[in-house]
């Protein structure tokens, strides 16, 4: 295990670095409550990293995964795992825990700023932040991952599911996972993670949307740690489907159409 103190978080320091030294104390207190600073640091001090971190984090929160289809995962070739993204936290840890153990930690998963804050998963998590300059490097980062010898794990929707017209829906899938898989001859493994966040998460997201706040910062993202905290003790069903050969994706459909085809296949698992 690594030096554990380097992984602890100081919400006050984070807020002051982002918002200035005069950050209101009430805001810091609210941040500590929403981010469950003490709860997280108790676990972070254990010093776990990599796949061990993902497994132990789920164990710490008493989260159980009921995984179906493990026997379908090929171990003799490069693949891309394409999963739905209902939660924003536990589903990412589940990907690392499931496939990280099978592939001896040689995995890469593209995630947002929220998950990149987990330094314990440096080397496995790769940033795809759309806010700020990192987006300019996205193409190069994606190429580097797919042309490596690591197994690629992706949430093609890019962000976790939202409430749309009263229904919880996965966002349309971007085609990048598909075009890069074809380019690098990776079969695609479809995966369906069953679960959803609380009504409060979707309500806050709706408020952020109608007020325009989400254009600067996705408001509901601030609740993701609290959503994970509230989900302690839950059991999630995870279904892994048959690998889809990369040669399946011919010219009979456009790449964007094939991407939605895979999305539908995941939804039907």
Regions found by a protein language model. Name each.
Residues 1-79, 85, 90-94, 104, ...:
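Membrane-anchoring hydrophobic helices of lipid-metabolizing enzymes
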Residues 2-7, 11, 138-269:
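Non-catalytic C-terminal accessory region of glycerolipid acyltransferases
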Residues 96-102, 181-183:
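Short, surface-exposed basic-aromatic patches at helix termini and helix-loop junctions that form
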Residues 80-82, 125, 153-155:
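Structural motif
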């Amino acid at each position: 295990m690594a030096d554990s103190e380097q992984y602890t978080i100081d919400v006050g320091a984070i807020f002051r670095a982002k918002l200035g030294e005069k950050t209101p104390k009430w805001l810091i207190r609210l941040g500590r409550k929403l981010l469950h600073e003490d709860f997280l640091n108790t676990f972070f001090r254990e010093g776990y990293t990599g796949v061990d971190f993902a497994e132990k984090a789920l164990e710490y929160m008493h989260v159980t995964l009921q995984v179906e289809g493990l026997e379908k995962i090929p171990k003799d070739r490069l693949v891309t795992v394409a999963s739905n993204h209902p939660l924003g936290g536990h589903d990412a840890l589940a990907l690392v825990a499931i496939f990280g153990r099978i592939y001896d930690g040689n995995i890469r998963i593209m995630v947002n700023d929220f998950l990149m804050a987990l330094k314990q998963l440096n080397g496995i998590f790769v940033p795809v932040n759309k806010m700020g300059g990192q987006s300019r490097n996205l193409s190069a980062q994606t190429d580097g991952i797919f042309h490596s010898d690591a197994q690629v794990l992706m949430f093609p929707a890019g962000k976790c599911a939202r409430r749309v017209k009263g229904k919880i829906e996965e966002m349309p899938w971007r085609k990048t996972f598909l075009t890069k898989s074809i380019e690098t001859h990776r079969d695609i493994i479809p995966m369906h993670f069953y679960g959803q966040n609380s009504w409060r998460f979707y309500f806050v997201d709706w408020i952020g949307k109608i007020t325009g706040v989400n254009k600067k910062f996705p408001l509901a993202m601030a609740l993701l740690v609290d959503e994970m905290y509230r989900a302690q003790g839950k059991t999630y069903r995870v279904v892994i489907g048959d690998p889809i050969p990369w040669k399946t994706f011919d010219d009979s459909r456009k790449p964007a159409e094939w991407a939605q085809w895979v999305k539908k296949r995941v939804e039907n698992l």
